[in-house]
Structure formats: structure tokens, C-alpha cells
């Protein structure tokens, strides 16, 4: 059983859902991720989505775009992101670690090279928001050969026939996009989220993890009623931007604990 599968099985047995923070590798400072991930894991985070900086992050709103630009200014590359995963494992981080990035930089780096390196570093998979299902076979097969998962997306606008195609090829968990548009904290989630998740549930036993717009305990409570996990990204990056350097780690951990107060399943 993979580390991702073990994590969701353990949480399910405990009656809880997963909280998965998103962090841009190398933001705010080059080594910040190495300090933040262990602290957030200790605060109760279950998995981590670690963003590879890219100059044209199409799926991301202004908050993560700023974080990405800062990380690029700090000189962060794909190789640095993979090395960060290895260092986090050396620091005894046990949670699943997935790299999120865009396809062109990964293609330039080399799919086989990237999968082999991420597996050797102790990573668990890829999240590639601009990779359509029709073009995913190469990376999906290489990832599987290295015991990595390629996480696939389902959005409110995904047609039923395409949901069936995605669930047939998915592994690890499914990333359920809670609303249309780019990433960013919102006050409310999509009204049809419950129906979307019910439809997907009929077609897969994989865990369903909701992302985009998650920012407050009420959102976590809403997701806990219908899904297996929630991803918090832009709201966490916002906090890191606002906090003074000496308070970033403790403040981020406090935010995770605040969100987790709503994570127990009813």
C-alpha cells in the first residue's frame, strides 16, 4: 500500500478527513519549506502539495503567482524541489509529499529523469493542472513504474462521460476543484459541489480531495460532510506574506490547527 493510501486509510478509520497544505517551494525564503513542512505536519497536516515555481502558472490566482515569482527570484528549480523532498525525508517528515507543477518545465527536465529522482527522494506523486487526460499517458505510466501517483482533476464543468474516463485512469486520490476559475481564497464554495462529489463517488473508491477557495474552518466543515480531504493554498500563502519572518512558522502552524478544529467527520 502506498503512503497516500495508508494515510487515507488511517484517517478514515479515525473518522477524519485529510488537510493538505499547499506551499510554493522556496517561498517566502529559499529554505522556508524545510521549516514549514515539519511544523505543519506536527500541527496535524496529513499530506503536502509542494509547488514548483513556474513563470506562467495558468491555474493560479494572484496570491500564488506572487509566491511563485518570489521563489523564482530565490533561484528555485525543479531539481531544488526534488532535493527539498529528499531533505524533508531526512528530517523525518512522514506525510505524503507531492510536487505540483506545470507540464512544459517537467517535459524539458525529462519525465523519466524527474520520476526517478522524485521516487529516490521519497516523493509520492505529481499534480499537473495543465496536463489533459489525452496527453497524460507518458507521465502516468512513468510515474506508476516508479510507484508514484499522478493526481487527476475533476471540476464542476467536467462532463459525466469525461469523469468516467478520468476515474478509470486515476490513482492516489482525485483532486476535486470546488469552483471554476483560478486558485484563491473565497468566502463560499460552489453550490453544486455536493452533487459533483456524489456523482464521482459512484464511479471510484479513490479518496476525493477538494481544493480551490478553501480558507476557513466553515469550509473544512462543509468539505468534511462530503469528501475525504481539503487543500488549503492561497489562504495559507496570504498568511505567510503578512506574517513577520520570526512568526511565519508558528503562525502557519496555528492556522492549520484552527482549520483542523473543523476536520472531524460528523
Swiss-Prot record:
E.C. designation(s): 4.2.1.20
InterPro entries in UniProt: Aldolase_TIM, RibuloseP-bd_barrel, Trp_synthase_suA
Amino-acid biosynthesis as UniProt keyword: yes
Protein name per UniProt: Tryptophan synthase alpha chain
Quaternary structure (record): Tetramer of two alpha and two beta chains.
Record carries keyword RNA-binding: no
Active site positions: 49, 60
Domain of life: Bacteria
Family that this chain belongs to: Belongs to the TrpA family.
A Pfam family hit: Trp_syntA
UniProt GO molecular function: tryptophan synthase activity
One BP term from GO: L-tryptophan biosynthetic process
Gene designation: trpA
Gene3D superfamilies found in the cross-reference section: Aldolase class I
Pathways involved: Amino-acid biosynthesis; L-tryptophan biosynthesis; L-tryptophan from chorismate: step 5/5
Purpose: The alpha subunit is responsible for the aldol cleavage of indoleglycerol phosphate to indole and glyceraldehyde 3-phosphate.
Catalysed reactions, semicolon-separated: (1S,2R)-1-C-(indol-3-yl)glycerol 3-phosphate + L-serine = D-glyceraldehyde 3-phosphate + L-tryptophan + H2O
Enzyme superclass (EC): lyase
Keywords: Amino-acid biosynthesis, Aromatic amino acid biosynthesis, Lyase, Tryptophan biosynthesis
GO cellular component terms, A-Z: cytosol
Amino acid at each position: 500500500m502506498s503512503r497516500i493510501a495508508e494515510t487515507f486509510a488511517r484517517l478514515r478509520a479515525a473518522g477524519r478527513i485529510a488537510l493538505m497544505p499547499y506551499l510554493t517551494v522556496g517561498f517566502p525564503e529559499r529554505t522556508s519549506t524545510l521549516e514549514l513542512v515539519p511544523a505543519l505536519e506536527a500541527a496535524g497536516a496529513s499530506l503536502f502539495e509542494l509547488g514548483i515555481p513556474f513563470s506562467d502558472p495558468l491555474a493560479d490566482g494572484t496570491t500564488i503567482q506572487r509566491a511563485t515569482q518570489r521563489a523564482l527570484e530565490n533561484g528555485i528549480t525543479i531539481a531544488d524541489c526534488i532535493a527539498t523532498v529528499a531533505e524533508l525525508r531526512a528530517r523525518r517528515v512522514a506525510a505524503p509529499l507531492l510536487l505540483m507543477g506545470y507540464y512544459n518545465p517537467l517535459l524539458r527536465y525529462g519525465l523519466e529523469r524527474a520520476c526517478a529522482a522524485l521516487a529516490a527522494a521519497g516523493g509520492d506523486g505529481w499534480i499537473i493542472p495543465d496536463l489533459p487526460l489525452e496527453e497524460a499517458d507518458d507521465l502516468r505510466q512513468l510515474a506508476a513504474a516508479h510507484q508514484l501517483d499522478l493526481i487527476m482533476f475533476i471540476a464542476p464543468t467536467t462532463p459525466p462521460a469525461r469523469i468516467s474516463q478520468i476515474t478509470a485512469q486515476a490513482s492516489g486520490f482525485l483532486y476535486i476543484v470546488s469552483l471554476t476559475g483560478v486558485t484563491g481564497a473565497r468566502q463560499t464554495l460552489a453550490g453544486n459541489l455536493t452533487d459533483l462529489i456524489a456523482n464521482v463517488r459512484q464511479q471510484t473508491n479513490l479518496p476525493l480531495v477538494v481544493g480551490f477557495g478553501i480558507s476557513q474552518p466553515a469550509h473544512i466543515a462543509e468539505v468534511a460532510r462530503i469528501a475525504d480531504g481539503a487543500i488549503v493554498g492561497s489562504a495559507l500563502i496570504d498568511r505567510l506574506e503578512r506574517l513577520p519572518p520570526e512568526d511565519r512558522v508558528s503562525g502557519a502552524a496555528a492556522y492549520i490547527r484552527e482549520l483542523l478544529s473543523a476536520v472531524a467527520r460528523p
